[in-house]
A protein has these predicted regions:
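Secondary-structure transition motifs
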Residues: 2-16, 69-70, 86, 91-198, ...
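Short structured motifs
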Residues: 58, 72-75, 108, 157-158, ...
Length: 377
């Protein structure tokens, strides 16, 4: 009896062969990635860290190109040799066009990782004890310690702003901030014990600032922002394309002083006086505030809800206020509003909706007011 020849195993299909090649390619990519990480760590800890002082001229040149102004570093010291080493840059100076020191930073602690080294940046920058003088000139240009933050030409972008927003994390501790607004002509404002952090993960920008204002202003306050930029930016200023939310919290503040430094309110609402607690949220779209909400608990309020409306004097006011721009018109609303006025008007708890449309050609201005639970007795 003749036995049949053994059957040969079936050949793998084309799809299986393609999957095998793809798996091998992915494996080599993973191995190459980890090899690159290992080489980066070795280069960072074996070459850069031991010779960090020798890199001072290179760091000065790189910082000068990134910021667009001459940078001088007095001394570099190694502070930590952990997985992410950190260095202290002492007596960092940013020079103006005449070669004079425009901004002096006594201590800057920089953390360097392989990822940040590849993109010529830092994993974290901590600036301690800095005194920042921020000024908006009469032509609208922004300056920090005499260094221009806004570009000279509308067709250009600010190297200083772009570099700042490219850092993974930027921290300011124990600083002093002085704000001068020549465009609006408001008195200079000095903030002390400033603690600020800026994080830039991906397309997002997360900011927080805590500071102590002058005694007449009130108590320590907090400002926060959660903003996102588009994949393709078109504005000559980085933040012109951002959208997101702003938040402010004041445990005690003088509203009449606070409003001098806020963006101009196109709705015609003016608060001449008022003190108390305030929390506010603002919606931002393409770099402009489009609406907002505020929770308030105020005393001694003197306000005007519109240019054509009489002033309103209130002993106390509490509740939530909101508003938004509707083309040339604007809408104001309240939730859970209660107040007591000097003229005896008492509103226990209620809601208000006000819609104001300004005059347009032959059409007169119109104001619609809707309210519930109004007690005029």
């Amino acid at each position: 009896m003749v036995s049949a020849p053994p059957l040969s195993p079936p050949l793998p299909s084309r799809r299986v062969r393609l999957a095998a090649r793809l798996a091998r390619a992915l494996l080599w990519l993973v191995l190459g990635f980890w090899l690159l990480i290992g080489l980066s760590w070795g280069l960072l800890h074996g070459w850069i860290v031991p010779r960090i002082s020798d890199f001072r001229p290179s760091l000065e040149a790189q910082a000068s190109r990134a910021l667009g102004v001459p940078v001088r570093i007095g001394e570099i010291r190694v502070r930590s040799l952990g997985l992410i080493p950190s260095f202290e840059l002492r007596e960092v100076s940013l020079l103006d066009r005449d070669g004079h020191t425009a901004l002096r930073l006594p201590s800057v602690v920089a953390a360097l990782s392989p990822r940040s080294a590849w993109r010529l940046g830092f994993e974290q920058l901590v600036i301690e004890g800095a005194e920042l003088d921020i000024r908006r000139r009469a032509d609208g240009q922004l300056e920090i310690a005499g260094l221009r933050l806004s570009p000279v030409d509308d067709r250009e972008r600010s190297a200083f702003a772009d570099w700042t927003l490219a850092q993974t994390e930027l921290v300011l501790r124990g600083g002093t901030l002085r704000w001068t607004d020549e465009l609006r002509g408001t008195p200079p404002l000095a903030l002390t014990d400033v603690q600020a952090v800026l994080r830039n993960p991906g397309q997002r920008h997360l900011m927080r600032l805590d500071a102590t204002p002058p005694p007449a202003w009130g108590e320590r306050f907090s400002l926060r922002a959660m903003l996102k930029k588009p994949l393709l930016a078109t504005g000559h200023l980085p933040w012109q394309d951002w959208s997101g939310e702003l938040y402010a919290e004041f445990s005690r503040a003088d509203v009449s002083l606070l409003r001098q430094y806020l963006p101009t309110d196109q709705s015609g609402v003016v608060v001449s006086s008022g003190q108390g607690a305030l929390r506010a949220w603002a919606d931002v779209r393409n770099g402009a505030v489009t609406g907002g909400t505020a929770d308030v608990l105020l005393q001694g309020v003197n306000t005007r809800l519109g240019q054509d409306l009489p002033p309103l004097v209130l002993k106390t006011v509490a509740g939530r206020f909101g508003g938004r721009q509707l083309g040339s018109a604007y809408e104001l609303r309240t939730e859970g509003l209660s107040f007591a006025a000097d003229d005896g008007l008492d509103w226990p708890v209620g809601n208000v909706l006000l819609l104001h449309t300004p005059a347009d050609g032959n059409k007169p201005a119109q104001t619609e007011l809707t309210a519930d639970r109004l007690d005029l007795g």
